[in-house]
Amino acid sequence: MDATVTVVGNLTADPELRYTATGAAVVNMTIASTPRMYDRQSGEWKDGEPLFLRGILWREYAINAAASLAKGMRVVAVGKLKQRNYETREGDRRTSVELEIDEIGPTLRYATAKCSRATQAGHGVSPDPWADSQTGQGIDSHTTRSEEITENAKNGEGAGKNELNKKVLVGDNVSYEDFDSDEVPF
């Protein structure tokens, strides 16, 4: 049974992107998680002992993390704790615990983030996840007046909320005017 944990902390260095002999991308990083406790006697917050946890990511996920994360960033990581036994050059046996990361990203407590869809050559990932597989047309080709509707609602013009509710994603030759507000599923 794997022990799944969530760790929140700061990256101690930029993620280290390397490639195995077979060409698989791998990233190693260290997350420093320092608990903070309130000392009632002094009336101050104090740092506890930091935990330095080594994390590892593989393949496309490793490439995306290396391109997105940097030293000092506060991140939240979810993964499985793995114990690794090894022998040093001197012949000493050692054990280390690593976090095999399933999910990682910046926390938004003290920062903002903008995300963009990663495209990997040869992996069939479309730059537009909503694109029609046959025509290649994206979502913008299927919406009608969405910017105008949004602007009118902000200015109190038009039908307001009801008009905004009609901003639905529909196929070719169908527009939001074809729906009554009672038919809109939201």
UniProtKB/Swiss-Prot annotation:
Coiled coil: none annotated. It comes from the Bacteria. One of its GO terms (biological process) is DNA replication. Homotetramer. The keyword DNA repair does not apply. One of its GO terms (molecular function) is single-stranded DNA binding. This is Single-stranded DNA-binding protein 1. Keywords: DNA-binding. Residues 120-186 are annotated as: Disordered. Residues 175-186 have a biased composition (Acidic residues). Residues 1-108 form the SSB domain. InterPro entries: NA-bd_OB-fold (IPR012340), Primosome_PriB/ssb (IPR000424), ssDNA-bd (IPR011344).
